[in-house]
Amino acid sequence: MQPIYQYAWIIPFVPLPVTMSIGLGLLLVPTATKNLRRMWAFPSVSLLSIVMVFSADLSVQQIDGSSIYQYLWSWTINNDFSLEFGHLIDPLTSIMSILITTVGIMVLIYSDKYMSHDQGYLRFFAYMSFSNTSMLGLVTSSNLIQIYIFWELVGMCSYLLIGFWFTRPIAANACQKALVTNRVGDFGLLLGILGLYWITGSFEFRDLFEIFNNLIHNNGVNSLFATLCASLLFAGAVAKSAQFPLHVWLPDAMEGPTPISALIHAATMVAAGIFLVARLLPLFTVIPYIMNLISLIGVITVLLGATLALAQRDIKRSLAYSTMSQLGYIMLAPGIGSYRAALFHLITHAYSKALLFLGSGSIIHSMEPIVGYSPDKSQNMVLMGGLRKYVPITKMTFLLGTLSLCGIPPLACFWSKDEILNDSWLYSPIFAIIACATAGLTAFYMFRTYLLTFEGYLYAHFQNYSGTQNSSFYSISIWGKEEPKLVNRNLLLSTINKNEKVSFFSKKTCKINGNVRNLMRSFSTHFDNKDTSMYPHESDNTMLLPLLVLVLFTLFVGFIGIPFDQGVMGLDILSKWLTPSINLLHQNSNYSVNWYEFATNAFFSVSIAYFGIFIASLLYGSVYLFFQNLELINSFVKIGPKRIFLDQIINVIYNWSYNRGYIDVFYATSLTKGIRGLAKLTHFFDRRVIDGIMNGVGVSSFFVGEGIKYLGGGRISSYLFVYLSYVSIFLLIYIFFFRKVESIKLFQTKNGIPLYL
């Protein structure tokens, strides 16, 4: 056993000193800590880099054939109950550690510049370091109790990060929504853990799997109860990984800063649910109903996430629903028995999605000086377009991330997604058809996002910022894209008088086709003899460096799953890496597929992706804009019943997507209003009934006491008289009532009448 394994317990705690130091600094020497705030990025990156090197060494040891290592120490020693803590090092742990640290380092470097202007800079890095600590603790946990502790810490960190700008009501509501939604899954996870302990008497993974499998095979446990416990465990993963129907928190989580979105969607919170399913898969595999449930939830999430992304205008929300759909693929894979493909896609998707989110942050950063610092404008793709000329490096990196997510070879996601699609055909043709159709939808909405952002014109220059637009000046294309029709660019880009000092937009008005409209001045504003460009600008090198590094991962990380062994797949790095875990699942560790079969299946999936890209290019690309500007569409396509029916279908799809499938509305009307109504009813019952009884007894006692006080007059003889009077009355009632009852019983006995009559 390598000595490095003995020190693996330190992995989760290495980033923690940053959080503690920032907290103590703000508490003891707040002024000095705030003045030196930019220095905290360096220790954050440095400490996480140490963990990355440590994790890389562990990964190399795993690939070279090291076995699973577990170290435990007892927390409590009792004859009836034993609780042990420790760390578990296996391929799954090493994979997750590499993902968390590499993506985390890129996000921290990026955030140093992105958050430099923010007053919460120190708080941001404290939260980020604590989030990395929580996630590293989760993936190294050796039992379910540790899993649950760090699971809750990850949820708390996501709450703090999503609500980072808590003074904004939308952000405050978003973090509360994420917390409440995840509490549903967390409660199920807790019940499932307690149920499994009741069945097996152990929290340790190895003991738990062995005992549970023996009980299932020997019918030693009620199958319905075992299925219920496993379903409750899976509920925790459903909520944390934003699977249907507990996915509603994910798009609202975009209210946090963009680096937080990259970290949550790539390597931390949403990956935690996938990690839990992968960790407990040996338990799930012995219950066929759970495997069917996992695959069903996965395929529903795949399709739902893709359809909800079709009409989003916010660039971050579009990527959020993309994450939801891709997580559906990752959840589908273990459900159909494809453990290797699930972890493969988890790796490739993490780097591609981190690249896309950080790229979107660069885009937002470049748009904010033009449209303002409101997320409703700076993240709105309707106001973007034509950015390829202004942010070429961001454009190149975003395009590569988009193509990777579309499944275009030789980029990373192609290899992993294609493996899932191939395995789905072996499991269920229906699931395979849905997965393949969603691959086309993925290519469509991802390329739609790219085209709306980087192609065409910069539509912010054609927008008046009162929130309205000239109807004749605009042509609204399919699903929210605003396009100029026969625009005189010289008129729109007319220059201002250099002797004037004005705000961003002129108050002059001019006539355009008979309509009065605010005329935008030249996008160069003069402040104190200094020209400030009002076009987007490329981000700082500190923000571009992580993008370029993630591009390298996107280009080459897919090769870890590609064999180089004369045509039969089975000797690739990933298969060697996962051999101990696959053997634990009692599967054949030699993953072999003929290259000819692989190429045939890949051709089909790539064709679907290219078809989606082609449709997106037709609807949002330069070809569509060319025909629209020449007004040739209506010349060739006559408006008839078929055209009207097609438009109605498009409107239905658009409304479904834009309104989030009406799922949020359903929850708001049924659950939220129902719970509030129940709370009001409970409040009424508590105040009027319970408190009414208590208050009524008190008031009655008060009046009785007052009456007796006035009746007695304060003399002892009067009190004795009243007391004797009450005693006499009770004696008379007793004599009259009980004597009458005894007489009736005696009469019945003498006459032979049953006593119960």
From Swiss-Prot:
Gene3D superfamilies: 1.20.5.2700
Keywords in alphabetical order: Chloroplast, Membrane, NAD, NADP, Plastid, Plastoquinone, Quinone, Thylakoid, Translocase, Transmembrane, Transmembrane helix, Transport
Cellular compartments annotated: Plastid, Chloroplast thylakoid membrane
Entry's transmembrane regions: 9-29, 40-60, 89-109, 122-139, 147-167, 185-205, 219-239, 258-278, 280-300, 327-347, 354-374, 396-416, 425-445, 544-564, 607-627, 692-712, 718-738
InterPro entries from the UniProt entry: NADH_UbQ_OxRdtase_chlpt_su5_C, NADHpl_OxRdtase_5_subgr, ND/Mrp_TM, NU5C-like, Proton_antipo_N
Top-level division of the source organism's lineage: Eukaryota
Single Gene Ontology BP annotation: electron transport coupled proton transport
Swiss-Prot/TrEMBL catalytic activity: a plastoquinone + NADH + (n+1) H(+)(in) = a plastoquinol + NAD(+) + n H(+)(out); a plastoquinone + NADPH + (n+1) H(+)(in) = a plastoquinol + NADP(+) + n H(+)(out)
Pfam families the record matches: Proton_antipo_C, Proton_antipo_M, Proton_antipo_N
UniProt topology in membrane: Multi-pass membrane protein
GO CC annotation, single: chloroplast thylakoid membrane
One Gene Ontology term of the molecular function aspect: quinone binding
Assigned EC number: 7.1.1.-
Electron transport keyword on record: no
Similarity section: Belongs to the complex I subunit 5 family.
Function: NDH shuttles electrons from NAD(P)H:plastoquinone, via FMN and iron-sulfur (Fe-S) centers, to quinones in the photosynthetic chain and possibly in a chloroplast respiratory chain. The immediate electron acceptor for the enzyme in this species is believed to be plastoquinone. Couples the redox reaction to proton translocation, and thus conserves the redox energy in a proton gradient.
Record's protein name: NAD(P)H-quinone oxidoreductase subunit 5, chloroplastic
Species the sequence originates in: Drimys granadensis
